Curated annotation (Swiss-Prot):
Record text on subunit structure and interactions: Heterotetramer of two alpha chains and two beta chains.
Ranges of residues in domain Globin: 1-141
Tissue expression as described in the entry: Red blood cells.
PROSITE patterns, sorted: GLOBIN
UniProt organism field: Gyps rueppelli (Rueppell's griffon)
Name of the molecule in the record: Hemoglobin subunit alpha-A/A'
Length: 141
């Protein structure tokens, strides 16, 4: 459960991220594909090379979904309901991949905004990413 302080921390971090959705999203995906190669299996039709237009476009969607969750931080489940349906029913993405993606996103945030990612903010952002992952996997059950 996100506390009021967690929500404030997450919203503050995302003020730094919003203008970089495509770049940070692409970097997150590239990092995930490199660090966890089995995650590539869900993207057989993508050009997975650095700078790929497909990676940039999907990265922008990923960060866009996170921004949507931040904008509706008191109702993440409602905000991401359609995305949850898509991943559970059509794409059937292994739920562990959301955790891996979240870890890679944290690294990207740390690289680009090291002074913002204090231990307290890191904990808040991690809790938020876990909450998003839980919403995206809730309909698997």
């Amino acid at each position: 459960v996100l506390s009021a302080n967690d929500k404030t921390n997450v919203k503050n971090v995302f003020t730094k991220i919003t203008g970089h959705a495509e770049d940070y999203g692409a970097e997150t995906l590239e990092r995930m594909f490199t660090t966890y190669p089995p995650t590539k299996t869900y993207f057989p039709h993508f050009d997975l090379h650095h700078g790929s237009a497909q990676i940039k476009a999907h990265g922008k969607k990923v960060v866009g979904a996170l921004i949507e969750a931040v904008n509706h931080i008191d109702d993440i489940a409602g905000a991401l309901s359609k995305l949850s349906d898509l991943h559970a029913q059509k794409l059937r993405v292994d739920p562990v991949n959301f955790k891996l993606l979240g870890q890679c996103f944290l690294v990207v945030v740390a690289i680009h905004h090291p002074s913002v990612l204090t231990p307290e903010v890191h904990a808040s952002l991690d809790k938020f990413l876990c909450a998003v992952g839980n919403v995206l996997t809730a309909k698997y059950r």
